[in-house]
Amino acid sequence: MLKMAKVEPVERYCKVIRMIRFCVGFCGNDVADPNFRMWWLTYAVMAAIAFFFACTGYTIYVGVVINGDLTIILQALAMVGSAVQGLTKLLVTANNASHMREVQNTYEDIYREYGSKGDEYAKCLEKRIRITWTLLIGFMLVYIILLGLVITFPIFYLLILHQKVLVMQFLIPFLDHTTDGGHLILTAAHVILITFGGFGNYGGDMYLFLFVTHVPLIKDIFCVKLTEFNELVMKRNDFPKVRAMLCDLLVWHQLYTRMLQTTKKIYSIVLFVQLSTTCVGLLCTISCIFMKAWPAAPLYLLYAAITLYTFCGLGTLVENSNEDFLSVIYTNCLWYELPVKEEKLIIMMLAKAQNEVVLTAADMAPLSMNTALQLTKGIYSFSMMLMNYLG
């Protein structure tokens, strides 16, 4: 009977990296390449985003100035947030390509070094890559299903209800979308832009998910090292090795802090843009639903809500990891069995763990589920006010 070869954690990690690189490479932003620099595809994507912004401005002009319809502003701005998010992720990650590679390669080195040690280390790696892989696939399905439905809605309306409905809420200058040919060209442009936007946003999100979900991995391996350290301390017969292992624990905690600081440095602005534009998009989409101006609005509303809570959930993940790290150092470490000099090292590490780095939206608000709840309350209040206004 043939047995399937076991896939090592490092191989699964590299598989995740390849999938992310394919998505971001689709938009010319493969920052994992040591020789990365912006090239024609990168600039083409930026030009496409600029084209979308210009067409959105034109759409607002036509609606407000020519047709006298102020509601077109809300309709046109509903999906602008996604474009702003994509452009921000592209520019920020391209500008921080070296830091992106540093974090990515650090985690890969951890997989290579500790995957070969087996036992508890291998379990930590397998658990973490399983969580990461599940998150990536789950979010991919969200993108494919919801954005796919947004694209197919106009086809359904055209074939079944014989109505011409736009995929995205923007017009192209000098193109008459009321004709069959004009509507087809406009729909094709919408589909192309939303496809590129989906790939780009997904790839940008996955790098953040990869980095944040692997922060607890360092904490988990620290716990295994601490268990080995305690066992050696209780033997009381190899103090030089005890001191060496203690120094290793200090280095590991510094690595945890450095990975958090680097991730925050890269994504602080991205997270601010993500939260702010998602909230604006939610408000505009809710307005479209009340005005019955965009049949696919409920789908985009669901996508935006999932995005908001997923990103805030990442912040809570980091907060929980920090609390666990502090608890492990304080309760699991046999610091009282060490000489005074070594106890001071533990106290220093404990003091640092009490003021650990957390993810924020440009240092303006912590990224957490509590923040998501507060934003949801504000959006709910706006929805009730709009409902009363529209009667």
Curated annotation (Swiss-Prot):
Cellular component annotations (GO), alphabetically ordered: dendrite membrane; plasma membrane; sensory dendrite
Say which domain of life the source belongs to: Eukaryota
Topological domain spans for side Cytoplasmic? 1-45, 93-140, 186-191, 290-297
One Pfam family, short name please? 7tm_6
Give the molecular function GO annotations: ionotropic olfactory receptor activity; odorant binding; olfactory receptor activity
The miscellaneous comment for this protein is:
The atypical heteromeric and topological design of the odorant receptors appears to be an insect-specific solution for odor recognition, making the OR/Orco complex an attractive target for the development of highly selective insect repellents to disrupt olfactory-mediated host-seeking behaviors of insect disease vectors. Odor-evoked OR currents are independent of known G-protein-coupled second messenger pathways.
**Tissue distribution:** Expressed in antenna.
State which residue ranges cross the membrane.
Answer: 46-66, 72-92, 141-161, 165-185, 192-212, 269-289, 298-318
- BP-aspect Gene Ontology terms: courtship behavior; detection of chemical stimulus involved in sensory perception of smell; detection of pheromone; response to pheromone; sensory perception of smell; signal transduction
Where is this gene product found? Answer: Cell membrane
Q: What ranges are annotated Extracellular (topological domains)? A: 67-71, 162-164, 213-268, 319-391
Q: Keywords of this protein's UniProt record, alphabetized?
A: Cell membrane, Membrane, Olfaction, Receptor, Sensory transduction, Transducer, Transmembrane, Transmembrane helix
From the Swiss-Prot or TrEMBL record, give the protein name: Odorant receptor 67d
Subunit record text: Interacts with Orco. Complexes exist early in the endomembrane system in olfactory sensory neurons (OSNs), coupling these complexes to the conserved ciliary trafficking pathway.
* Membrane topology (UniProt): Multi-pass membrane protein
Q: What does this protein do?
A: Plays a role in detection and sensitivity to pheromones and signal transduction of the fatty-acid-derived male pheromone 11-cis vaccenyl acetate (cVA). Acts in concert with Snmp and lush to capture cVA molecules on the surface of Or67d expressing olfactory dendrites and facilitate their transfer to the odorant-receptor Orco complex. Necessary to mediate behavioral responses to cVA by regulating both male and female mating behavior. Activation of Or67d neurons by cVA inhibits courtship of other males, whereas in females their activation promotes receptivity to other males.
Listed as disulfide-bonded, the cysteine pairs are: none
What family is reported? Belongs to the insect chemoreceptor superfamily. Heteromeric odorant receptor channel (TC 1.A.69) family. Or67d subfamily.
Principal subcellular localisation of the protein: membrane
In terms of InterPro entries, this protein maps to: 7tm6_olfct_rcpt
Knockout or disruption consequences: Mutant males inappropriately court other males, whereas mutant females are less receptive to courting males.
